[in-house]
């Protein structure tokens, strides 16, 4: 959890926002997945948001569902994902690592065991996409017991009660949804969410990061101009992996070329 705090403090001092890429662990295979993650960090990623392949990804658009299918095709298991997480943490001791996942994967292991494992491999945060705030107690309590930040999604239509709950229960950062619906770069992010950002600040919520449909530097800049602490981009990155699936070196070069201007857009 502390890694997020020190990241946001450092970024504030440098007058920068955070750029955070999302990828599915093990896509398109364990070895290339590790190279992808190294490349994202070298290109300027401030933190990582990682998915664990799951058979029924409700909130994901087709791009990220395909990433999951590729990881499954490569035989990637949740146990292997935790081995990969330990390797990433070893190699990159200071970068915040977040997991974005579904409740079934947590239940399969047992809630407490799952968060204990996260703590052991050095995961900083977990967002359980299909657990609403009002049902989150067992997850967030286990997370805090194991020094893992529970992350909550703040939808564009959040009312005051929900904003207060998110501010009270969330740690690390707040996942600010650009709009309702499934993920995807083709559904460009809507207008900046100034009013939500202002409310979250008022209630002392963890710093908001805007996600969903972030695929261009101008959107990163707009998110930060609206008061967000940074932006998360998933589908646009996973699409690059898909486009260069048979050319691993080209894939890494294209990822670097995408991330560098996205990170540059966080500098005011």
UniProtKB/Swiss-Prot annotation:
Tetramer of two alpha and two beta chains. It catalyses: (1S,2R)-1-C-(indol-3-yl)glycerol 3-phosphate + L-serine = D-glyceraldehyde 3-phosphate + L-tryptophan + H2O. GO terms for cellular component: cytosol. Pathway: Amino-acid biosynthesis; L-tryptophan biosynthesis; L-tryptophan from chorismate: step 5/5. The gene is trpA. This is Tryptophan synthase alpha chain. InterPro entries: Aldolase_TIM, RibuloseP-bd_barrel, Trp_synthase_alpha_AS, Trp_synthase_suA. The alpha subunit is responsible for the aldol cleavage of indoleglycerol phosphate to indole and glyceraldehyde 3-phosphate. Transmembrane segments: none annotated. Its EC number is 4.2.1.20. The active site is at residues 49, 60. It holds the Pfam family Trp_syntA. Keywords: Amino-acid biosynthesis, Aromatic amino acid biosynthesis, Lyase, Tryptophan biosynthesis. One of its GO terms (molecular function) is tryptophan synthase activity.
């Amino acid at each position: 959890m502390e890694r997020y705090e020190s990241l946001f403090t450092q970024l504030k001092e440098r007058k920068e926002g955070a750029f955070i890429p999302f990828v599915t662990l093990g896509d398109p295979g364990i070895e290339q997945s590790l190279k992808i993650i190294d490349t994202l960090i070298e290109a300027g990623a401030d933190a990582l948001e990682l998915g664990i392949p799951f058979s029924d990804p409700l909130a994901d658009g087709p791009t990220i569902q395909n990433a999951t299918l590729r990881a499954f095709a490569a035989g990637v298991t949740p146990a292997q994902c935790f081995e990969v997480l330990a390797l990433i943490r070893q190699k990159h001791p200071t970068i915040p690592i977040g997991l974005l996942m579904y409740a079934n994967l947590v239940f399969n292991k047992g809630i407490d065991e799952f968060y204990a494992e996260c703590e052991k491999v050095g995961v900083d945060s977990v967002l359980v996409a299909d657990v609403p705030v009002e049902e989150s107690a067992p997850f967030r309590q286990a997370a805090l017991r194991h020094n893992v930040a529970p992350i909550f999604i703040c939808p564009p239509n959040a009312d005051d009660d929900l904003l207060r709950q998110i501010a009270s229960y969330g740690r690390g950062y707040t996942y600010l949804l650009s709009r309702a619906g499934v993920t995807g770069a083709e559904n460009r992010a809507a207008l900046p969410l100034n009013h939500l950002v202002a409310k979250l600040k008022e209630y002392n919520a963890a710093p908001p990061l805007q996600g969903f449909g972030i695929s261009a530097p101008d959107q990163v800049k707009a998110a930060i101009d609206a008061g967000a602490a940074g932006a998360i981009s998933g589908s646009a990155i996973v699409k690059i992996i898909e486009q260069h699936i048979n050319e691993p070196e080209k894939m890494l070069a294209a990822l670097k070329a995408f991330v560098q201007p996205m990170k540059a857009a966080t500098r005011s």
